[in-house]
Amino acid sequence: MIKVILWDIDGTLLNFKMSERYAINYCFSKFHMGTCTDEMLQRYSVINRGYWERLETGELTREQVMLGRFHEFFESEGLPTDQVKAFNDEYQIRLGDKAFFCDRGDELVKQLKSTVKQYAVTNGTTVAQERKLRLSGLDQLLDGVFISEQVGVDKPQKAFFDAVWNEIGSYAPDEVVIVGDSLTSDIRGGKNAGILTDRKSVV
């Protein structure tokens, strides 16, 4: 019997693509970089995903991901790279300006609130995730939030989940399920932790 659900946030409960589009367009306007077309945004998303996957394998640090993805993207689009850090700092803030639920994610969390413990487990940045959780109301619905930047280690590392267990207590492996969209972060992380996994299928 499931007693604990570990929810990924971006791409699982909240629609990251919509927040990403808003934040990128906002920053392009603020930094006078013209228009970010759909084709450009798609190319950025591919670059961004690659950097996050390298973080998950331990190949890159978080700072290398934050700055490297935009440096590579700007170079590929012929844009100046001198404001990469300022752009990323603003981008992180703007990611938290708006929160869009995936499918009926909010309704599902509400329905499950009285029957299971629910926690957020996310590799997103603190500044972006705390604002999105507050704006969406998830901070009031969930029993707790674990942000890898604060934990000090990222999903899918087993040490991340060990930190979760230290906070919430011990459960049998078949009493905990992680629900997420990422095979490399959420599903692999769940397998590393020895718990049940669900690739977003319940959302």
Regions found by a protein language model. Give the residues of each.
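Short acidic capping loops at alpha-helix termini that bridge into adjacent secondary structure
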Residues: 83, 140-144, 172-176
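Conserved Lys-Pro-Asp/Glu-containing loop-to-beta segment of HAD-superfamily phosphomonoesterases
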Residues: 154-187
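Structural motif
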Residues: 192-193
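Residues at the starts of beta-strands that form the adenosine-phosphate
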Residues: 117-118, 175, 196
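Conserved small/polar residues in nucleotide/adenosyl-binding loops
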Residues: 202-203
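N-terminal helical cap/lid subdomain that shapes the substrate entry/recognition surface
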Residues: 2-103
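Substrate-recognition element of Asp-dependent hydrolases with the DxDx(T/V) motif
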Residues: 84-88, 94-100, 105-136, 144-148, ...
